[in-house]
Amino acid sequence: MSATEQTLDEMLHAVADPTRRRILNALKEKRACSIGKETGLCACDVEQRMHLSQPTISHHMGILKKAGLVQASKQGQWVWYRRNETALRELARNLRSAL
């Protein structure tokens, strides 16, 4: 299996779950605690939006991060998540060429 195929498989696994797709959609929007799209969404905003516990959000974010679809940065006590638009475009391009 080539590196591109392996990356595509990881990305497809990440977006196969409806909760993770909802998280990716939520990351498009600015929420209450979030200061801007450059920073992304605060983990607390993701929790509130998804109505899920912090450990569940961490689990899903870990899978999205491993696939390269989200980026995280820690600022103080908070973790801020944002979409990796380059990786999402790559996913769409690789999916088109794989099928």
Identify the residue ranges that each predicted region occupies.
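Short, intrinsically disordered or compositionally biased N-terminal tails of bacterial proteins
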Residues: 1-8
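Short, charged/polar, Gly/Pro-enriched secondary-structure boundary elements
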Residues: 87-91
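N-terminal helix-turn-helix DNA-binding core of bacterial DNA-binding proteins
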Residues: 10-13, 19-53, 79-86
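A common structural junction motif
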Residues: 98-99
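Alpha-helical residues within the helix-turn-helix
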Residues: 48, 59, 65-66
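Beta-hairpin "wing" of winged helix-turn-helix
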Residues: 65-75, 82
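Residue-level signal for well-ordered alpha-helical positions
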Residues: 27, 94-95
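Base-recognition residues in the alpha-helical recognition helix of bacterial helix-turn-helix
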Residues: 25, 58-60, 77
